[in-house]
């Protein structure tokens, strides 16, 4: 019987997606997130606060590796990669532990964390192996969270989806920068975008996004490619969305302003509280006007507009 190794990493909440992505890059065959907030239940209202539930500062990222992988090497590589990123984000003191699992335990363990989750008014994320019957008007995003990049329920992803729901009316061209799982591209298509171009620097993300897109019917309007932010891109867009680290976001703002059409939108997420002012100032210096600012915990998401009429935007 094949055995698997379970590697658990305890990290500050804001490091969830970063550590998950690093573990996948280091060969994990699946990633699960243990979070105290997962037990409050799924609701169909965005941004609901549950004061009776204590939000712990740390979450646990669990990665699964076949027994042919030397997890001590994975641990060392992870520590080295994290140390390179300490200037961008305080992840706290990493706690790492490993456990051996039988194959049937692996199959059950990582799947038990994932159930259908209503993310916004219209959008519900459903694991690929789950049979789910949509209600009237409900739009379903099928994801395989075992591939990489979590389930799409992280606050930065939730707020990005909410922002897309806010700005898309049908017929738009969308650029999805740092696509990861492809969830924002899939959502854009479901919300009526005519054409979506998804980019990621990571070859794993490009493959995973394509595989997730193929789980959802009618997604032929999504085009996935390797790319370094918006460098070399010449496609004009109605909406540009990016859910990546704040220190990386500021490097795409000028290209975003060049590519977004007049009256178009730039959605940025993945911004921790301490970096918000930096991102806002960079976007406004480029010529964008802030239309919507959302906050959930330590995370910020913003919708900027390229417009000459600022009467309807924040501060206008």
UniProtKB/Swiss-Prot annotation:
GO terms for cellular component: cytoplasm. CDD domains: AdoMet_MTases. Its EC number is 2.1.1.-. One of its GO terms (biological process) is methylation. It is found in: Cytoplasm. Keywords: Cytoplasm, Methyltransferase, S-adenosyl-L-methionine, Transferase. It catalyses: L-lysyl-[protein] + 3 S-adenosyl-L-methionine = N(6),N(6),N(6)-trimethyl-L-lysyl-[protein] + 3 S-adenosyl-L-homocysteine + 3 H(+). S-adenosyl-L-methionine binds at residues 157, 178, 200, 243. InterPro entries: Ribosomal_L11_MeTrfase_PrmA (IPR050078), Ribosomal_PrmA_MeTrfase (IPR004498), SAM-dependent_MTases_sf (IPR029063). Its main location: cytoplasm. GO terms for molecular function: protein-lysine N-methyltransferase activity. It is an enzyme of class 2 (transferase). Methylates ribosomal protein L11. Belongs to the methyltransferase superfamily. PrmA family. HAMAP family: Methyltr_PrmA (MF_00735). This is Ribosomal protein L11 methyltransferase. It comes from Streptococcus pneumoniae (strain JJA).
């Amino acid at each position: 019987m094949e055995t698997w190794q379970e590697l658990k990493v305890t990290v500050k909440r804001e490091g969830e997606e970063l550590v998950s992505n690093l573990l996948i890059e280091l060969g994990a065959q699946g990633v699960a997130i243990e979070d105290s907030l997962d037990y409050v239940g799924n609701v169909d209202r965005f941004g609901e606060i549950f004061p009776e539930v204590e939000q712990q500062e740390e979450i646990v990222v669990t990665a699964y590796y076949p027994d042919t992988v030397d997890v001590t090497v994975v641990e060392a590589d992870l520590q080295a990669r994290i140390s390179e990123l300490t200037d961008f984000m305080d992840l706290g003191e990493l706690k790492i532990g490993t456990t051996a699992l039988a194959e049937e335990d692996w199959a059950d363990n990582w799947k038990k964390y994932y159930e259908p989750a209503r993310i916004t008014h219209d959008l519900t994320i459903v694991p690929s192996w789950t049979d789910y019957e949509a209600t009237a008007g409900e739009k379903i995003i099928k994801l395989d969270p075992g591939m990489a990049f979590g389930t799409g329920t992280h606050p930065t992803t939730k707020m990005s989806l909410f922002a897309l729901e806010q700005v898309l009316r049908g017929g738009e061209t969308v650029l999805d920068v740092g696509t990861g799982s492809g969830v924002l591209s899939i959502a854009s298509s479901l919300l009526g975008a005519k054409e979506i171009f998804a980019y990621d620097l990571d070859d794993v993300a490009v493959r995973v996004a394509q595989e997730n897109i193929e789980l959802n019917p009618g997604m032929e309007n999504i085009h996935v490619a390797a790319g370094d932010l918006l460098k070399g891109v010449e496609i004009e867009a109605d909406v540009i969305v990016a859910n990546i680290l704040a220190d990386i976001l500021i490097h795409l703002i000028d290209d975003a302003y060049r590519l977004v059409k007049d009256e178009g939108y730039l959605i940025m997420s993945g911004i921790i509280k301490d970096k918000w002012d930096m991102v806002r100032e960079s976007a406004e210096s480029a010529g964008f006007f802030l239309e919507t600012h959302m906050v959930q915990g330590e995370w910020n998401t913003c919708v900027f507009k390229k417009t000459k009429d600022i009467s309807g935007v924040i501060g206008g």
